[in-house]
């Protein structure tokens, strides 16, 4: 469960919304939608504990440490950093106790699962946008966090990559994890995500995604 009470976020002295209250049930799958500049990505950072709210609080039903995984937008990653794809993905083992053999087997399985086999030693700068995004998603897959925050996870993915992404999102949801997904593709939200949180400068609305999208036919999201 993610409960936000009296929450305001944004730059100091410049809140993006008035104080809002909403609760995302444990095991729910929710899209965050809204126009450019309404603070969708910032909201995920506040929930993740990476950005302080201007007011209010976020309460989780599990300890934050080790219980939450956050997928940021890939433009925040330094692609000049001298590591390989395999090393990037293996960073997802942080805090997980496994034997070297267990790690090796799990890493190999995850790389194959995200169609990254054969790219293990490729440096970040040599990866395509889609390959890098799948690597970041593979890193996320190594953890078993009950709460997953995904900021535009479909970015840079081709049609095959997006199908793979939604397959995993549905699998994580079926496992009972709580997922919050920033997504600008309303057609994908309507098809794959049952609930949506619409953010406007006037506040937030939480409702079934089909209902919200139908009521907001001209909503531009990104």
What does each model-found stretch correspond to?
Residues 48:
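Helix-to-loop junction immediately C-terminal to a conserved catalytic motif
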Residues 159-161:
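Helix N-cap at the start of a conserved alpha-helix in ABC-type nucleotide-binding domains
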Residues 148-152:
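Catalytic Walker B motif of ABC-type/P-loop ATPase nucleotide-binding domains
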Residues 102-119:
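Conserved ABC ATPase "signature" region
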Residues 194-210:
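H-loop (His-switch) and adjacent beta-strand-loop-beta switch element
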Residues 123-127, 131:
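Conserved ABC ATPase signature
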Residues 183-184:
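H-loop/switch region of ABC-family ATPase nucleotide-binding domains
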């Amino acid at each position: 469960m993610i409960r936000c009470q009296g929450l305001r976020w944004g730059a100091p002295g410049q809140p993006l919304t008035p104080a809002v209250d909403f609760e995302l049930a444990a095991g729910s799958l929710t899209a965050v939608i809204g126009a450019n500049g309404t603070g969708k990505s910032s909201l995920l950072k506040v929930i993740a504990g990476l950005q302080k709210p201007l007011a209010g609080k976020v309460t989780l039903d599990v300890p934050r440490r080790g219980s939450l995984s956050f997928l940021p937008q890939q433009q925040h990653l330094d692609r000049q950093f001298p590591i390989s794809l395999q090393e990037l993905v293996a960073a997802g083992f942080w805090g997980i106790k496994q034997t070297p053999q267990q790690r090796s087997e799990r890493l190999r399985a995850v790389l194959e699962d995200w169609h990254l086999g054969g790219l293990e030693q490729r440096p970040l700068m040599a990866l395509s946008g889609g390959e890098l995004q799948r690597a970041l998603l593979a890193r996320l897959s190594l953890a078993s966090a009950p709460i997953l925050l995904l900021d535009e996870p479909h970015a840079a993915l081709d049609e095959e990559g997006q199908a793979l992404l939604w397959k995993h999102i549905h699998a994580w949801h079926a496992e009972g994890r709580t997922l919050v997904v920033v997504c600008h593709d309303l057609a994908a939200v309507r098809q794959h995500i049952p609930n949506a949180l619409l953010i406007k400068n006037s506040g937030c609305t939480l409702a079934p995604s089909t209902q919200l999208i139908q009521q907001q036919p001209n909503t531009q999201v990104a």
